[in-house]
């Protein structure tokens, strides 16, 4: 059962990366189209921060998910990585979509664009298949067990 859950979690994380990418694209385009207080949103430093932070969230999520899928594909023990993406990716999606909503203003929470649905979906994923706290405990236990056995953690190459 855990193998099926693991593959499902990877699938949901890959889907979340795609949704983050879409929200990011919408946010950047909106910042280039929207004028506020005599200037375009894309000239504002807070928007630069939103773009940079979202870029990092998406890249980290994408790379963590790919790494996890590679471990699974090679038949390795991916339990810790599965728990890590289960915690990190939905939280990152929540942050990226929240920033996109901020850039869109009231339009961001309307049914006219998909951001409000993405926001709800991201929050729901943080509860599905066990809350974040359970997975954090599993990550810590797996890491500590390896160190207690005289090993260190291999983050890959």
Question: What is each model feature region?
Answer:
Residues 2-157:
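Alpha-helical interface subdomain recognition
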């Amino acid at each position: 059962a855990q193998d099926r859950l693991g593959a499902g979690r990877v699938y949901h994380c890959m889907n979340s990366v795609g949704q983050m990418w879409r929200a990011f694209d919408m946010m950047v385009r909106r910042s280039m189209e929207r004028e506020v207080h005599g200037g375009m949103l894309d000239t504002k430093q807070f928007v630069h921060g939103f773009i940079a932070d979202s870029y990092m969230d998406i890249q980290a999520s994408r790379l963590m998910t790919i790494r996890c899928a590679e471990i699974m594909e090679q038949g390795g023990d991916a339990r810790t990585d599965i728990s890590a993406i289960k915690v990190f990716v939905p939280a990152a999606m929540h942050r990226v979509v929240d920033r996109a909503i901020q850039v869109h203003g009231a339009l961001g929470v309307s049914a006219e664009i998909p951001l409000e649905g993405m926001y709800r979906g991201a929050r729901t994923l943080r509860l599905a298949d066990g809350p974040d706290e359970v997975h954090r405990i599993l990550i810590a236990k797996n890491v500590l067990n390896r160190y207690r056995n005289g090993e260190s953690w291999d983050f890959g190459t």
